[in-house]
């Protein structure tokens, strides 16, 4: 949580006391937020519940009771927490109005400062556990509030410290969920068994309503920035046998794959007359030794190999990105460093990265792409994985960025299929001597809805993947007009 007690808070000249009595009611406070910026990371309802009125200037709010003003709200801020910091003697914060029988349409969270309420950012509902009752916890989840009690024991669920244990909870993970169990488990989350709701084993925070472009690590950090697991703190617990349960990663092992290269001096010798752009000393310090084939290197401990180095690439960074479970990496750089690398590097960067061209590493790249929720959704629609991978790689090569929405990916896949189809039929078209006007007419017909023949096609049917109707006609059908398959989902796309 970010808090600036000097720049973002101040005390304002007290207003009319009689007028203040009007705002004892939360509903009356909420009405002042009619023109409050919708882009604010803290919602109007949360601020009103914390005793604030909107001043009409920027995101500045003012307490109706103590008249302290706060502005410059940031993601993760607690409305009640900031209120209490700048005005610890505020009568509202200290429960004066409750003790005197004032009616207050607020959750029990604010009374006597028992809980600290925070807003829900974006479309994700989330909260921390350890509540007095599951009923109250469900209420907080529905209303998008966060309750954070800092004096609790971490991790909240020691039985879920192991990534393998978390993975086992996803046996009944719903098909409609956009993220893969592997990605969620790696981010410290396990399945609660309710809808697509997951929970962090460490901080107890819950997340649900996942969207196609969400990344588990990013959402975990955005909503629970103080989680010890996200921060890379040591949250390992002792098992019944007394052995520490470390966080599990692929390729993690306590003994090095190549003990002969365990020493820096042994690794640096292998580079000889190294002529490549990346610094050989940095490579050796990061655990790598040269294989004598181009710029291929391999880690002595985890056995992970990398090649095709670029001048700007950092060996430690690439080590953490590709082989986060390496024990040597963990010992040298710490869990927080590894977490930050995975939070700041997108899938797109890892796709263009050409790792050592061995079957195992190639499979690792393919697995990474396959786990992308957008890719899985496209496969469900009937698109071929090779076509999806090729389209994503072309996007990265031409624009330098990855797809940010499923709609754009689907549109490009459909466009690529049409291009291929046109290429294959070009020779036949020439042989049949079809006129330019006829070709244009056919292309225009291809874009038209096959039901009304008036509007352009705009909907892909799942699971068959057929693209045949406009949005209006799609609403009237339950089965695909092409193959009669029952439609389970209708995905809107944009045709260029």
Swiss-Prot record:
Compartmental location: Cytoplasm; Nucleus
Alphabetical keyword list: Apoptosis, Cytoplasm, Isopeptide bond, Metal-binding, Nucleus, Phosphoprotein, Repeat, S-nitrosylation, Transferase, Ubl conjugation, Ubl conjugation pathway, Wnt signaling pathway, Zinc, Zinc-finger
BIR repeats: 26-93, 163-230, 264-329
A GO MF label: cysteine-type endopeptidase inhibitor activity
Cross-link Glycyl lysine isopeptide (Lys-Gly) (interchain with G-Cter in ubiquitin): residue positions: 321, 327
InterPro entries xrefs: BIR_rpt, BIRC2-3-like_UBA, IAP, XIAP/BIRC8_UBA, Znf_RING, Znf_RING/FYVE/PHD
Matching SUPFAM superfamilies: Inhibitor of apoptosis (IAP) repeat
A Gene Ontology biological process term: nucleotide-binding oligomerization domain containing 1 signaling pathway
Principal place of residence: cytoplasm
Taxonomic superkingdom: Eukaryota
Family (UniProt): Belongs to the IAP family.
Role this protein plays: Multi-functional protein which regulates not only caspases and apoptosis, but also modulates inflammatory signaling and immunity, copper homeostasis, mitogenic kinase signaling, cell proliferation, as well as cell invasion and metastasis. Acts as a direct caspase inhibitor. Directly bind to the active site pocket of CASP3 and CASP7 and obstructs substrate entry. Inactivates CASP9 by keeping it in a monomeric, inactive state.
Subunit structure as annotated in this protein's UniProt entry: Monomer, and homodimer. Interacts (via BIR3 domain) with DIABLO/SMAC; the interaction inhibits apoptotic suppressor activity. Interacts with HTRA2/PRSS25; the interaction inhibits apoptotic suppressor activity. Interacts with TAB1/MAP3K7IP1 and AIFM1. Interaction with DIABLO/SMAC hinders binding of TAB1/MAP3K7IP1 and AIFM1. Interacts with TCF25 and COMMD1. Interacts (via BIR3 domain) with SEPTIN4. Interacts with RIP1, RIP2, RIP3, RIP4, CCS and USP19. Interacts (via BIR 2 domain and BIR 3 domain) with HAX1 (via C-terminus) and this interaction blocks ubiquitination of XIAP/BIRC4.
Protein name: E3 ubiquitin-protein ligase XIAP
């Amino acid at each position: 949580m970010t808090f600036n007690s000097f720049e973002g808070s101040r005390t304002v000249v007290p207003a009319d006391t009689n007028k203040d009595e009007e705002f004892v009611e939360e509903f009356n406070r909420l009405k002042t937020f009619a023109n409050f910026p919708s882009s604010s990371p803290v919602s109007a309802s949360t601020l009103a519940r914390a005793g604030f009125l909107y001043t009409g200037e920027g995101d500045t709010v003012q307490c109706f009771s103590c008249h302290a003003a706060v502005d410059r709200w940031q993601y993760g801020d607690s409305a009640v927490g900031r209120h209490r910091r700048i005005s610890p003697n505020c009568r509202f914060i200290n429960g004066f109005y409750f003790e005197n029988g004032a009616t207050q349409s607020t959750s029990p969270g604010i009374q006597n400062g028992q809980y600290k309420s925070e807003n829900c950012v974006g479309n994700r509902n989330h909260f921390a556990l350890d509540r007095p009752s599951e009923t109250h916890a469900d209420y907080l989840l529905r209303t998008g509030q966060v309750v954070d009690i800092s004096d609790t024991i971490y991790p909240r669920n020691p039985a879920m410290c192991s990534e393998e244990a978390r993975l086992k909870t996803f046996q009944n993970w719903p098909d409609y969920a956009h993220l893969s169990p592997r990605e969620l488990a790696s981010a410290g989350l396990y399945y609660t068994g309710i809808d697509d709701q997951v929970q962090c084993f460490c901080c107890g925070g819950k997340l649900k309503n996942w969207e196609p472009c969400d990344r588990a690590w990013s959402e975990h950090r955005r909503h629970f920035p103080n989680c010890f697991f996200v921060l890379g703190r040591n949250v390992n617990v002792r098992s019944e046998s007394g052995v520490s349960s470390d966080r599990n990663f692929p390729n993690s092992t306590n003994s090095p794959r190549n003990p002969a290269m365990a020493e820096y001096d042994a690794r640096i010798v292998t580079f000889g007359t190294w002529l490549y752009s990346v610094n050989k000393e940095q490579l050796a310090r990061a655990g790598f030794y040269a294989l004598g084939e181009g710029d291929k290197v391999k880690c002595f401990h985890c056995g992970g190999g990398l090649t095709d180095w670029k001048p700007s690439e950092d060996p430690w960074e690439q080590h953490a990105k590709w082989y986060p479970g390496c024990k040597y990496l963990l010992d040298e750089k710490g869990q927080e460093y590894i977490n930050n690398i995975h939070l700041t590097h997108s899938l797109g960067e890892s796709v263009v990265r050409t790792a050592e061209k061995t079957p195992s590493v190639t499979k690792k790249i393919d697995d990474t792409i396959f786990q992308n929720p957008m890719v899985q959704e496209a496969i469900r629609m009937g698109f071929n994985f090779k076509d999806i991978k090729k389209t994503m790689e072309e996007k990265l090569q031409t624009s330098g960025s990855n797809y940010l929405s499923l709609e754009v990916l689907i549109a490009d896949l459909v466009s690529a299929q049409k291009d291929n189809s046109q290429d294959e039929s070009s020779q036949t078209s020439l042989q049949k001597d079809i006129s330019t006007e006829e070709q244009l007419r056919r292309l225009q017909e291809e874009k038209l809805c096959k039901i009304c023949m008036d509007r352009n096609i705009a909907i892909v049917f799942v699971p068959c993947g057929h693209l045949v109707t406009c949005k209006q006609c799609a609403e009237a059908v339950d089965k695909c007009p092409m193959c009669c398959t029952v439609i389970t989902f209708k995905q809107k796309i944009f045709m260029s």
